[in-house]
From Swiss-Prot:
InterPro entries documented for this protein: Meroterpenoid_MTases, SAM-dependent_MTases_sf
Organism: Aspergillus calidoustus
Protein name in the entry: Methyltransferase ausD
Domain of life of the organism encoding this protein: Eukaryota
Enzyme Commission code(s) on record: 2.1.3.-
Transmembrane listed as a keyword: no
Alphabetical UniProt keywords: Methyltransferase, S-adenosyl-L-methionine, Transferase
Length: 279
């Protein structure tokens, strides 16, 4: 079941998506504030209103937590211990995809730090998300539409695979995998491996919602077909993928500090960072 269908099913069962919508911002934090002003040329005194107006309009159509809680202006990619490697590789010509990129906000961070836009790709199921990214950052003249692909990662006949299969060097996946159950996560990650070049050094960097309390995990699985990992299940997932693909994959994991989880209604939630490198 896709995220849209999951949300509709939850609403039908009594879930109120408005609990995901926080109050309007009074301050837009760095680094996105400077990116909006310098790269998107939005006047400094208009930035807060610009972000609030876009959030309200987007949430009315897509009542997702990432929109209601302004996650699209809380950039996190630069906090990854692998960010410097990703940035330098892209500057030297490697191709990077942000999978489930939403408004493409992390790609704008890479661009602001000097990554060539033509080496960056973003993909999301919703074309409207990609369009909203342009409305947020006002940077269409410097970030070609051809770099953003509306596609379903589960569909190997989609434009994403037609254009990029076997060509990518790095795939970044942030707060995306948890909306799938275990089996779908396996399929998503196998498909991601197919998008990557079949060469040593191909890299996946993940930011995953995780949970320390198995009772909370089980309750979440009953409510919606999400799969929130703990460290053991994450390692088990990659053991299964190694077995299924016969690939040599080195998996690094760490706990990544993140303000987002402070707002999460479930106890024991944290962000698990991981990097998976092909050998």
């Amino acid at each position: 079941m896709h995220p849209d269908a999951q949300l509709k099913a939850a609403v039908k069962n009594g879930f109120d998506p408005n609990i995901l919508c926080q109050r309007r911002l009074t301050v837009v934090k760095e680094p996105v504030r400077t990116i909006l002003e310098k790269q998107g040329t939005i006047p400094a005194d208009k930035i807060v209103d610009h972000v609030n107006e876009l959030r309200d309009r987007a949430f009315a159509v897509f009542p997702y937590a990432c929109i209601g809680q302004f996650s699209f202006v809380e950039l996190s990619i630069a906090e990854s211990p692998y960010y410097r490697e990703m940035l330098e590789r892209v500057k030297k010509g490697d191709l990077l995809l942000d999978l489930g990129c939403a408004f493409g906000q992390e790609l704008r961070q890479l661009m602001f730090d000097g990554a060539p836009p033509t080496n960056l790709y973003g993909s999301d199921l919703q074309q409207e998300f990609l369009n909203l990214g342009y409305e947020l950052f006002l940077d269409q003249p410097i970030f070609p539409e051809s770099q953003l692909i509306a596609a379903d990662i589960l569909d190997k006949k989609s434009a994403l695979f037609v254009r990029l299969q076997g060509k990518l060097n790095i795939v970044y996946i942030s707060l995306f995998l948890h909306v799938f159950d275990w089996d779908k996560q396996v399929t998503v990650l196998e498909n991601v491996l197919d998008l990557l070049a079949a060469t040593p050094g191909s890299l996946i960097v993940c930011r995953v919602i995780a949970c320390r309390n198995q009772a909370v995990l089980n309750k979440t699985h009953e409510r919606m077909p999400y799969y929130y990992h703990d460290l053991a299940s994450w390692n088990k997932l990659w053991e299964e993928i190694r077995t299924r693909t016969s690939l040599r994959l080195a998996v690094d994991v760490w706990e990544q500090p993140d303000d987002l989880v402070k707002k999460h209604p479930l106890p024991g939630i944290y962000v698990l960072g991981s990097a998976i490198r092909r050998h």
